[in-house]
Structures are given as C-alpha cells and as structure tokens.
C-alpha cells in the first residue's frame, strides 16, 4: 500500500546518491506517488532537481546518515553509489530499515573485493585471475603473480577512476600511484586482475522480484578510459552463451538477495562467460533501456523493490545510447544544437542537469532506436556529437 506524497501518510524513498541514475529512479518513484528525498555530497545534484527535498552530506558519515534516516523515516533506502556508510546501514537494517536490495548486498558490492570473493570463492564462478594489495611491495608481488599485462583498480571507485593497464614493468609504479589517487575513499587497497581473452563484454540487467528472477536482453557496450561511451541492446549472443550468462547472473543475485535490479557485468568468449562485477542498482550502460524497453531499468528497479510483479520484460528492438561527454571547467553549462541532434525519428536526448564540470564529465546521453544495432550506434554517436556544450 502506498500513501500520497507530501501528506501525513506518504510512502518515502530516500536516495543515497543523486546522479543521473538516481534522477531516473526518482522520476519513476514520482510516477507512483512516492515521496522522494535525495542525498548527495553536493547541492543541486540531478536527482535533487526532481525530488521533494534533499540533503547534502558525506554519506560515509554514519552518524549524519542515521540522523537523516531517523528524521525522514523512509519506507525504502535506495543506494545509488558505492561510497556509503554500509556498516551503519547493516546496523539499521537489523532494526527494521528496508535497504534496497539489502544492506548486505550494498556492503558486499561497495568494493570489488567483497563481490569478487563471493563470486570466485563462494559461488565458484569463473573470473579473471586476481590478487589484492594494501601497499606497494604487496602490489608488485601481485603484479608478478598475475602477470603482465594486467589491470589495476582501486577496490572502491567508479567511472574508471584510478583504473589503468600495466603493459610493461615501467607502468607498475604509475599504476599504483594512479590507483591511490582514484579511490572513492582515498588511498588504499587495490585489485590486480589478469588479462583474459574475450570476444565482447555485456551487462545483463537482472531483476529479482516478488514473482521471480527476470532478465533484460543483454546489453553490449564500449568502454574508454574505464567509463562507458556507447551501449546497445540486444547484444547478439549464442543460445548457450545466453544460458550461461543467465545462470551466472541468477546465482549472483540470489546470493545477494533482496528485490531490485542488478547490473551483472560479464565477459563472453564463444559460449563461455566470465564474471566481472555486479552493481545492486541500475547500471549506466542500461540507460539504453529508456528507449529500448517498455519498462526501463529504472522502472523495473522501483517496481521490484516496492514488491510489485514484473510479469514480462518487453524489448522493442535494436537500440543504442551514446554519452554526451563534456570537458572543461564551468558552473554555467549550457547546451546548443539540440534540434539538430533530434532531427531523426526515434531519437531522444537526456540532459542530466549536472550543475558544474571540472575536467571530463558525463553530461547527457542520446538514445536511438533503428532497424539494426549498427545504425542505432552510429546515429547515437553522431547525434551526441551534434550537441554543442557551452561553458
């Protein structure tokens, strides 16, 4: 049963993280008359612009987080980012707080170590070879064990921050320094991953709901500098590869438990899949579902965590997303040439409303639906380039 937003009987949703993904979750909550409270470390974040009210805080501060939760008494706490005081959420969940999908899932996936150990050591899923390191000497030993080339990532980071590839021994020290600069909570533990041979990588959006586990069509994507640039759906896969991907994803989400959508990242080689990572929330590559599906990943997430059935996920056909990427320094961001970007049918633009930029930042996305994946991706990329960012 839902109450009415802003009334005494309101059903409240507290968003922890208010970026572009949180913004779409907030909009889907609004469609159901839920009262949305958005939190982030900076003011005027995208989800705050469509929420009933908002708070600015360091979400790694457990005391500050608990104060807001006690004040707002939310029916659902919905994390959108990794950098949250997860130990506090675990404590509060034991006292009755409803964390989406669960506080355990949020804590385990907060860093790459928890989820990698779950997948490889508890669930016995295929992963790349890996080692963890806390200091430079252990890091060098980890690189030697895994072998060159290898990938280095902070155990806690997002959007490719702190991630690099070691191709020669000359890269080792630089990779360590870069990882120490890029972690969400500052310097610390890293994962060294061995290179694996794969044909392509996918995100398998997997919904755990009251009526079972459901799968979206696989999403292919292209990464650059550790961050996605384009995604498309459906990614062509063999029947055996799809079965293997769904088996792996279902095993992971059932181990994490709770209701909601999970972005399961997999490498695919022929009919074989290798587990990479999972996010217990909507995934950035899944923004393509805003044009490719009857229910976007955000609508599916809200429907699932509020205890409603999913029934059937309908996919409309070849679709793509391409990032509108800004680079500069400004608190006065404007966009021009939108009419040119929208000149073709079945094309949409989403501008995130980020209030500032300092360096490189994802500011929007172009969505397309065409007769083929190739056309969809090409048109999405070309139309994204037409959007002129004025700083």
UniProtKB/Swiss-Prot annotation:
GO MF terms held by the record: ATP binding; magnesium ion binding; phosphoribosylglycinamide formyltransferase 2 activity; phosphoribosylglycinamide formyltransferase activity
Enzyme's top EC category: ligase
Domain of life per record: Bacteria
Pathway stated in the Swiss-Prot or TrEMBL entry: Purine metabolism; IMP biosynthesis via de novo pathway; N(2)-formyl-N(1)-(5-phospho-D-ribosyl)glycinamide from N(1)-(5-phospho-D-ribosyl)glycinamide (formate route): step 1/1
Biological role: Involved in the de novo purine biosynthesis. Catalyzes the transfer of formate to 5-phospho-ribosyl-glycinamide (GAR), producing 5-phospho-ribosyl-N-formylglycinamide (FGAR). Formate is provided by PurU via hydrolysis of 10-formyl-tetrahydrofolate.
Cellular-component GO terms for this entry: cytosol
Organism: Vibrio parahaemolyticus serotype O3:K6 (strain RIMD 2210633)
The name this protein goes by in its record: Formate-dependent phosphoribosylglycinamide formyltransferase
Keywords of the record: ATP-binding, Ligase, Magnesium, Metal-binding, Nucleotide-binding, Purine biosynthesis
Family: Belongs to the PurK/PurT family.
